[in-house]
């Protein structure tokens, strides 16, 4: 079971329609050496803005895991959905929002990776490129 936060609210789409976006899902694992409260605060309170500022995202949804409902997934402590333009699949400048500036791309990449390393997201991270659909249930 997860909680949901939307620091950067994704654009609305019609029921059942695909969003015009690359939706990257990132499955985060907390390092065993880092207390849960510290990890959660570092991810939600510090890293969030770094991720938004260093990537070309137009939707950013965080899902802290509050309870594991099945066996086998207990090491995942957070799930992030980041929305990018479709061009971000093949263009690093679109992915990082660097506008074609190589130095800016490198600065953004380094800043993001340093931030990820601080709370353990530089290791054991699973990324799944996918699409975003919303359905009324």
Segments from the language model and where they lie:
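Macromolecular interaction modules
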Residues: 1-137
